[in-house]
């Protein structure tokens, strides 16, 4: 049985069956973010292991990682680094290609967004297959960052994303898991 906190978080997350395709249970975290108490508690729970530790910046993955990452950066008095899809940033960038189910995509960040040795927390709303999070972590590591942790509200453990980050030596923190998805 799950704790009251985890059960309340799960209740705050809308499940949309058969979206974006049949057989998929889409976990919509925007309902949690729209609930002030649930959102604040989620941010607090993601932050508390790192409060008092040196965290230079929080890197958020487009798009919901921006919302969550900005709140976490604020609480940790850290800077914020957006990791975006190719072509969305206006200055000199570094990018990485990664595989999708049906092709290849790229993500990027500003070349001067982090300095070698900076301690970074990587953030997104959910980890599923881990392809996007793995690419973001590799990009940060290539830039010389030390990734303190990767934080997500939701883990879909059956899809194996967490293992990809752990294989890179990145600790993973999640708040709730939806198994069987």
UniProtKB/Swiss-Prot annotation:
Keywords: Cytoplasm, Glycosyltransferase, Purine salvage, Transferase. It comes from the Bacteria. CDD domains: PRTases_typeI. Its main location: cytoplasm. It is an enzyme of class 2 (transferase). The keyword Glycosyltransferase applies. It is found in: Cytoplasm. It catalyses: AMP + diphosphate = 5-phospho-alpha-D-ribose 1-diphosphate + adenine. Pfam families: Pribosyltran (PF00156). Disulfide bonds: none annotated. GO terms for molecular function: adenine binding; adenine phosphoribosyltransferase activity; AMP binding. Pathway: Purine metabolism; AMP biosynthesis via salvage pathway; AMP from adenine: step 1/1. GO terms for cellular component: cytoplasm. One of its GO terms (biological process) is purine ribonucleoside salvage. Its EC number is 2.4.2.7. Transmembrane segments: none annotated. HAMAP family: Aden_phosphoribosyltr. PANTHER family: ADENINE PHOSPHORIBOSYLTRANSFERASE. Homodimer. NCBIfam families: apt, PRK02304.1-3, PRK02304.1-5. Catalyzes a salvage reaction resulting in the formation of AMP, that is energically less costly than de novo synthesis. Belongs to the purine/pyrimidine phosphoribosyltransferase family. This is Adenine phosphoribosyltransferase.
């Amino acid at each position: 049985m799950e704790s009251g906190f985890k059960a309340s978080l799960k209740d705050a997350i809308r499940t949309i069956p058969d979206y974006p395709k049949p057989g998929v249970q889409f976990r919509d975290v925007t309902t949690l973010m729209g609930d002030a108490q649930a959102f604040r508690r989620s941010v607090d729970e993601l932050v508390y292991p790192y409060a008092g530790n040196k965290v230079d910046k929080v890197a958020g993955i487009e798009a919901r990682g921006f919302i969550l990452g900005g709140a976490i950066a604020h609480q940790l008095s850290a800077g914020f680094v957006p990791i975006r899809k190719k072509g969305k940033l206006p200055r000199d960038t570094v990018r990485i290609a990664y595989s999708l189910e049906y092709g290849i995509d790229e993500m990027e960040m500003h070349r001067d967004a982090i300095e070698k040795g900076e301690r970074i927390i990587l953030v997104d709303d959910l980890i599923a297959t881990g392809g996007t999070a793995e690419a973001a972590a590799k990009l940060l590591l290539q830039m010389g960052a030390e990734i303190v942790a990767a934080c997500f509200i939701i883990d879909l453990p059956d899809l194996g994303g967490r293992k990809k980050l752990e294989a890179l030596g990145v600790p993973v923190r999640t708040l709730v898991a939806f198994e069987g998805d």
